[in-house]
């Protein structure tokens, strides 16, 4: 059993439960009986340095006999909290020891526990301030697999939501209990902003209550004063929280579509387990032929490929795997990849930016998402991480992008396609030493990528661009039609994009005002193709 199961479909898929029963759950009429949590997300307030503010808050309250616990995803993430003299529990025995000490009121922390989102209870005074720092990591091989192949899917959102809500619930164990829960770390704030709807009704309500009451917080003192309202039992806060929760009488119905998909998967697995592979494949047809998320549909095709292989039909197996890979490039690559699918280029940049902004429940969460992306745009990370971040960067200014080489062993590392039939064909050399020049091999790769581009986008004009540490090329190269985006120029572009996002992510902008603001800001910040080409892309010079 779990108090935070916000998606019932795994009960069907994992335990072969009767789907008709799962569609008619016994549930409470309201969420008014859950514990009181003041959930604060400093990253979506107006505080200039949210991380520093949270650290000062811990220092302020550590001697006030309020139990303080910090949950982090890993041991390495605990290092941050050394500066506030928090005690890290390195072993399970230490976790038990520190939890017992908190419950018996022999100590007040702050204690740091790694990957302890469930399995510990910290009721009443044992923990009045709970800090969840960073996005929980996958626990177990299946979740690690799912995080890779189901990126962005509702299934993965549900898995992470459960982990977050389990963590949030460590300090509030029932009705009549109360605590302050601070959600910090760029990845966590951004994730909640975009996946808000995947959380349970009670948690969503408490996050919204906190957002409405804390969005104007601008200083550390404001944050401390807000926390004191909960800890000192300020009646205005207590009554407001209770009234807002009491309004939630319409709980969401079960997600019938998810349950039906889970039931189909379970029945297909049962057939396969009995070596009835033909029936297993036939069962999955209802998913592969339906209008469902491409990630889920891709997995169904991949299972069909496996079942066909076990059945001795290698030809169908290869065909099914091609269909799977075409829908979800994170799945196994078939022996012969399917033809390249061009990325769409019909929408205007401003329209795509608006669509992205409106996906976030709290618009400032988009900026935290952006910060997470640009963290990998430095020469110290792997080339794969750098290329993925360069691809993702495009979406923040409404540019369609792709990684053709990663998908099909052909084409450029990164492709940015603009709505005016223009493109940047990019080969990334982020791991080169700062003084290394652009050489013949690099030149050859760009030429091959440009040939690929002309074959797949014949009506487009493109610039061959090397993302390189400097703008120096070997003297013997003919570099008249080859361009460079230096790491310094990339950093300048990133800074301009951030300034643009701060402008368009204001919560007071209506949807109609947002599109107008996006159009104007893209021009004023120089983020259209003609601006980027002129300001950030330059020609190589002879070394």
Predicted regions and their residues:
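Interdomain hinge/linker at the junction between the two RecA-like core domains of SF2 helicases
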Residues: 1-60, 213
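Conserved RecA-like helicase motor-core motifs
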Residues: 19-26, 67, 82-99, 400-404, ...
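Conserved strand-helix element at the start of the C-terminal RecA-like helicase core
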Residues: 60-84
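Conserved helicase motor
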Residues: 72-76, 88-102, 113-118
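Long, largely alpha-helical accessory region at the distal end of helicase-like NTP-driven motors
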Residues: 76, 174-301, 308, 510-543
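Catalytic core segments in nucleotide and nucleic-acid processing enzymes
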Residues: 94-98, 104-106, 132-134, 158, ...
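Conserved RecA-like P-loop NTPase helicase motor core
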Residues: 101-191, 432, 454
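Interdomain/boundary linker segments immediately adjacent to catalytic/signaling cores
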Residues: 321-324, 328-381
